[in-house]
Structure formats: C-alpha cells, structure tokens
Swiss-Prot record:
Organism of derivation: Oryza sativa subsp. japonica
Chief location category: membrane
Gene Ontology biological process terms in this record: maltose transport; sucrose metabolic process; sucrose transport
Record-given protein name: Sucrose transport protein SUT5
Its job: Responsible for the transport of sucrose into the cell, with the concomitant uptake of protons (symport system). Can also transport other glucosides such as maltose, arbutin, salicin, helicin, alpha-phenylglucoside and beta-phenylglucoside.
Keyword field contains Transmembrane: yes
The gene coding this protein: SUT5
Length: 535
C-alpha cells in the first residue's frame, strides 16, 4: 500500500525475508569473486564502468515503481467510476498486504535456490514483469472488456450507473498486479545485493535501488497528473471509455513501455552467476518452511522487540487511510467532484485526482530529501524521538486534512452549479502543502522502524531476516484491519474520507506517545535501512 503505499509498499512486502534462507559458503565465495571483477565478472573493467553498469542493471526498479505510483494515485478513484462504492474501495486493496506476506517469502525462498542458467533472480523478475504488463492492460481496458461481457451499451458520457462486469475485470487485474509487484520487488532487491557485494558493498546497491524507485515515483506521478493522454492519442477513447478512462489507458501504456525497456536493460546488464545444483541448500522444508521458521522465532524475541512491533502496528494504522484515499480526497472534498456523477462532475473529480497525483509527486520529493538527514537526526536525537516526532507530525497533518475537508464541504450542495467552478484556491494550496509535508514522516516510516528492529534483534543475536520478517507481521495485520473497516466506517458516517483520516490522526497521536514511552534508545540508521521500508 507502497513508496509503498510507495511503495507502501516495501514495508508490506518484506523484501529482506530472503535472509531467512541460506546457501552454502561456496556460493558466497563465487559471488564475491564475481563482484571483485565487475557486474559481469570482468576484472579489467574500470571502477566507473562497474558502477555505471551496476546502476543500469537496477533499472527495472524504476519501471516497476512507475507503475506502482500510477496504482497508488489513480486506481482507487478509477474503481469508483466502475460502480464500486466508496465504502468498499478499501476491500480491493486487501490483496496487497496478503500478497506481501505470502508471495515475497516464497519467491525469496525459491529464488535463493534457482539453478537456471540465466541466474537466480532474473527468471522471477522476467515472469513478474510480464504479469505486470498483462495486469495493467487488463485494468486499462476493463471498461471495454466489461462492455463486451454484458455491461451497458450506453455511451460513457451519459451513463452514470455501475458497470459490474468491468468492475470484476478490474479487480482481477488489480489483484494480479499486486501479486506480480511482490514477485519482482524481492528478487530485484536481492539481485542488487548480490551484484554490489565486493567492490561496492550492499549500501551502494540499495542506494541505487532507492534512487531508481525515486525516479520511477516522480515520473509515475507526473504521468498520473497528466490529463492530455486522450488528446494526444484519441484512439484511446471508446464508447465505454471516456476522457478519464482514456488518460488511465495512456498512463498504463507508458508503464508497459517503461517496464519492458527497463526489464530488458536489467536482463542484459545484470550478468548473474548461475547457481550450481550442489550449492543448493536442500535442508529446508520448502517455501512453507519460511513461515514455520518465522513463527517459531516469535517465541525467542527479546521483550523490547514486542514493543517495537506494537508501535509499528499502530503507526501503520495511522498511515493506511492516507495511502488509500489521498487522491480521492482531493477529488471529492477539495474539488467537489463525483466519480459517478454527471459528465461535468466526473470531469471535476478527475481534475482533483490529477491534482492529487501532483501532490504525491511533491510528497516523493520531500521523502527523498528527508531520507538523507534521518541518520543524522537519529544519531543526535535517538531513533525513538525521531519516530515519535514523525507520528505527531502525521497527527497534525491528518487534523489539517480533516479541517480543510470540512471547511471545503461546508455549505456545499452537489446540485449547485457553483461546485463546477473549481476548488477554493486557498484550500487547494493548503492541500498541496499537506501532501508535500507528509513526505517527511513517510521517510521515517520507511526507515526508522526497520533500523530499530534490526538493532534490537542484533543485540540479542538475531539477524536481519528475523527483524524484517517479524516486523512484516506488524505491518500486514493493521493494513488488513484498515482495509476491512475504513470503507464501512466512512459509509456509516456518510462523510467521504473524513472519518478515516480522523481515525488515522488519532492513531498517530497514540503512537507518538507510545514511541516515547516504549521504544528502546537506538541511534543507528544505515543507508540500507533507509530504503528497506519500501514505498
């Protein structure tokens, strides 16, 4: 749900679970020998050429993140145009945490043991990217497919009712997209760790991975904010797919293009060393052994770790409403649009969604800048103080969003033509500032919890895999809770997104207090930890 949800999103996918499974020492020696030459093993290659090749070998991370940014910014609003009620949009996102919890560990287990000639990671990256391309095309053409499956034949410019066949096609594509994203993310990050060992070190590899994710996020949100796709490519519009839908198609077409190009570059430059069959660790009990080992390890966790898990869970309870409803809030509460209203109201809503995508771009920039100063802040203030401050900031920003939404909707009547003149400029500016500022605590969300968990488990003799594995449980469970309850709560109050944001703000305040009281004093945040939290 991401960065997360960017990305939301590595936080919920637990890319580091591959550390729970091991290979023999001979494999590690081969990997170091490979890295001591170059990415492809050429010992004569200059250091500059090695780092450039390593940089482009990770290009697939940018392509995947581009598509993920589109998913975060556009798909909740788009699903409502197909007839999925605002109260049940959250249920379409329930696959994300499930996929992150189940798919990534299993893919990590088998990618550690893959003996194909093309390497351990690239087969999974290839298959995952192909499924992503198919999934986004299913989503983009869901309205057209639904029309052929029995939805209304009335033109989309006049029809305002539900299109259930299209909605079902959309959900299938959405869920496949979530599973495919998790298939690619773990092996791609693990491959960077493999290729950067030796000359460069894991921090360099993970920093490159993070940079590509940032590039993908910025380009993805720019694409989502663009409302000209239907003008540049008029053939995207059909009787079932009007301007907003055509813009979604255009954005996803570019996603397919970028994913194919970035995947091709990665497949060519990431010259992995094949794993010999005799080097495969066969002592485990298959992919399910990952879960068995994880839950067994819970019994041996240090007491401080349970407090870290509790604070992490409450933190994610506060974040998921924003991750899910950000652009919808801009389209509804600020722009006064309706996804299933008249053509004019739908256009206003679409304009608000695109403005929200621009706000998420500002959020990504703030996140990237903040990530560089987090290690220094943690060393100066301790990690728990930084974590606590970030939660109080989320509380303040959620409160502002609730207040701005209520002021914007005060006296508003959907039947009034004044609602079509656009949002209040001051309120729109405040909303964009909130979107930008929320990138600051989001940088903490994607780094500090992982660093604290790693330090606590390391003090007790645990490893990174243990830390990330158990922390993933504390991330998945609250996401499931919010996904199951946020929409129905909004529907019960009939207040749009305001109740979810209010609840999120309350959890953020509680978590700010708990972080100060419960968390141990730690100060270290490595570069790898900064990008481990995901998107």
């Amino acid at each position: 749900m991401e960065e997360g949800r960017r990305g939301d999103r590595e936080g919920k996918s637990a890319a580091g679970w591959t550390a729970l499974s091991t290979t023999k020492t001979t494999l590690e020696e081969k990997r170091r020998l490979q890295a001591n030459g170059s990415v492809g093993g050429d010992a004569g290659t200059s250091g500059f050429r090695r780092i450039v090749r390593l940089f482009f070998a990770c290009m697939v991370a940018g392509g995947i993140q581009y598509g993920w940014a589109l998913q975060l910014s556009l798909l909740s609003p788009y699903s409502q145009t197909l007839g999925i009620s605002h109260s049940y949009v959250s249920l379409t996102w329930i696959c994300g945490p499930i996929a992150g919890f189940v798919v990534q560990p299993i893919v990590g287990y088998y990618s550690d043991r893959c003996t194909m000639k093309m390497g351990r990671r690239r087969p999974f990256i290839l298959v995952g990217c192909l499924i992503i391309c198919i999934s986004v095309m299913i989503i983009g053409f869901s309205a057209d497919i639904g029309r052929h499956l029995g939805d209304t034949k009335e033109h989309c410019s006049t029809y305002t009712g539900p299109r259930w066949s299209a909605a079902m096609v959309y959900i299938v594509g959405f869920w496949f997209l979530d599973f495919a994203n998790n298939t690619v993310q773990g092996p791609a990050r693990a491959m960077m760790a493999d290729l950067s060992a030796g000359h460069h070190g894991p921090n360099v590899g993970q920093s490159i991975f993070s940079l590509w994710m940032a590039i993908g996020s910025v380009l993805g949100y720019l694409s989502g904010a663009n409302g000209k796709w239907h003008e540049w490519f008029p053939w995207l519009k059909t009787a079932a797919c009007c301007d907003a839908c055509a813009n979604l198609k255009g954005a996803f077409f570019t996603a397919v293009l970028l994913i194919v190009v970035s995947m091709t570059v990665t497949m060519y430059l990431a010259d992995e060393m094949p794993l010999d069959k005799q080097d495969v660790d066969t002592s485990g009990g298959g992919g399910c052994a990952v879960f068995v080992d994880l839950f067994k390890s819970l019994r041996n966790l240090p007491p401080a770790m349970f407090k870290v898990l509790a604070v992490t869970a409450v933190t994610w309870l506060s974040w998921f409403p924003f991750i899910q409803y950000n652009t919808d809030w801009m389209g509804r509460e600020i722009y006064h649009g309706e996804p299933q209203g008249t053509a004019a109201k739908a256009d206003v809503y679409d304009a608000g969604v695109r403005e929200g995508a621009m706000g998420l771009l500002f959020c990504s920039v703030a996140l990237g800048v903040t990530s560089f100063v987090i290690p220094k802040l943690c060393r100066r203030l301790t990690s728990k103080v930084v974590w606590s401050i970030s939660n109080f900031l989320v509380f303040a920003l959620m409160a502002v969003m609730v207040a701005v939404g209520m002021v914007s909707m005060r006296g508003y009547r959907p039947s009034l033509a004044a609602g079509l003149t656009g949002p209040d400029p001051t309120l729109k500016a405040v909303a964009l500032v909130v979107f930008a500022l929320i990138g600051i605590p989001q940088a903490v969300l994607f780094s500090v919890p992982w660093a604290v968990a790693s330090e606590v488990t390391a003090e007790e003799g645990g490893g990174q895999g243990l830390a990330i594995g158990v922390l993933n449980i504390a991330i998945v469970v609250p996401q499931l809770v919010i996904a199951l309850t946020a929409g129905p709560i909004d529907g019960a109050f009939n207040k749009g997104n305001t109740p979810a944001f209010g609840i999120g703000g309350a959890f953020a305040f509680i978590c700010g207090v708990l972080a100060l009281i419960w968390l141990p004093k730690t100060r270290g945040v490595s570069n790898a930890a900064v990008v481990a939290g995901g998107h």
